[in-house]
Amino acid sequence: MQVYGCCELVRELYAQIGSGDQGYIPQAISCAVKALNDIAADESLPKETREKAAFAAANLLISDFED
């Protein structure tokens, strides 16, 4: 996926990280899994949203890509 296929908020943060205005996290996969896990665990969110986050986190965890 390219950055231009992402929502405006993602594109804004991407630009800020690229310019040095926002911090870069070298262990991006771990950061993503933690964020997705937080979303999946948040019972105030719709079940469909939580399931999408859980599915994405599980796929990242099972992939052979490591930080």
Swiss-Prot record:
Record family assignment: Belongs to the UPF0253 family.
Source species, domain of life: Bacteria
Organism of this sequence: Vibrio vulnificus (strain YJ016)
Chain ranges passing through the membrane: none
Protein name as it appears in the record: UPF0253 protein VV2574
Pfam families associated with the record: UPF0253 (PF06786)
